[in-house]
Amino acid sequence: MAATLLAARGAGPAPAWGPEAFTPDWESREVSTGTTIMAVQFDGGVVLGADSRTTTGSYIANRVTDKLTPIHDRIFCCRSGSAADTQAVADAVTYQLGFHSIELNEPPLVHTAASLFKEMCYRYREDLMAGIIIAGWDPQEGGQVYSVPMGGMMVRQSFAIGGSGSSYIYGYVDATYREGMTKEECLQFTANALALAMERDGSSGGVIRLAAIAESGVERQVLLGDQIPKFAVATLPPA
């Protein structure tokens, strides 16, 4: 049965006998944060959000992953793609940005952090599987959101979504987002969008992690299962 599953998943011809015939598919897959990530800009800061499911093939490797990674005091990134790739890139950018801040003797710009992600993702675009959203606050530009998808492009947006679950919520976010939302409205908007994606996307799930970044600092919160927004799901009537 396992051999049949491996062949069906495109892992090559199924071995007739031997240990490979009984190896589950997730043992040969890399750990992935196939996921839903999001960031929204408001007047005075940004809100970031992500689900917490990490998968290895069809196996859920971690239910409570933290995909909101601090890069500096008021700069965070949301990670999607290969867990190993995104963690390595985030660690490298954190290291470089720390030195840059020491040289300037002042907090780094969000644009600088996004540019470092862009340079690394573009330089190693053939080897990396990493889609990243960078968001934060700095004294020059205030709250900012940058998207760096796979391939190394960088674009500033009022809001950004990414990951496997994002394809299910483009219609919702386009119809719901409006300029001038408050921090509380952005938090609710982000939580609703993530909940909708987690309902439909098998690679997204767990809890919802949120972060609000402003001049005053970073406020983080976690929405557990009974706190996640609920939406009606279409079902067939009973026979």
Swiss-Prot record:
Q: What class of enzyme is it?
A: hydrolase
Q: What induces it?
A: Down-regulated by IFNG/IFN-gamma (at protein level). Up-regulated in anaplastic thyroid cancer cell lines.
Location comes to: Cytoplasm; Nucleus
Question: Which residue ranges make up the pro-region?
Answer: 2-34
Spans through the membrane:
none
Task: List the GO terms this entry assigns under cellular component, sorted alphabetically.
Answer: cytoplasm; cytosol; extracellular exosome; mitochondrion; nucleoplasm; nucleus; proteasome complex; proteasome core complex
Q: What is its EC number?
A: 3.4.25.1
Could you tell me which Pfam families the record lists for this protein? Proteasome (PF00227)
Q: In the record, what terms sit under GO molecular function?
A: cadherin binding; endopeptidase activity; threonine-type endopeptidase activity
* Sites of Phosphothreonine modification: 69
**Organism domain of life:** Eukaryota
Q: Which UniProt keywords apply?
A: Acetylation, Cytoplasm, Host-virus interaction, Hydrolase, Nucleus, Phosphoprotein, Protease, Proteasome, Threonine protease, Zymogen
- Quaternary form? The 26S proteasome consists of a 20S proteasome core and two 19S regulatory subunits. The 20S proteasome core is a barrel-shaped complex made of 28 subunits that are arranged in four stacked rings. The two outer rings are each formed by seven alpha subunits, and the two inner rings are formed by seven beta subunits. The proteolytic activity is exerted by three beta-subunits PSMB5, PSMB6 and PSMB7.
Family note: Belongs to the peptidase T1B family.
Function, as annotated: Component of the 20S core proteasome complex involved in the proteolytic degradation of most intracellular proteins. This complex plays numerous essential roles within the cell by associating with different regulatory particles. Associated with two 19S regulatory particles, forms the 26S proteasome and thus participates in the ATP-dependent degradation of ubiquitinated proteins.
Q: What is this protein called?
A: Proteasome subunit beta type-6
**Which organism's genome codes for this protein?**
Homo sapiens
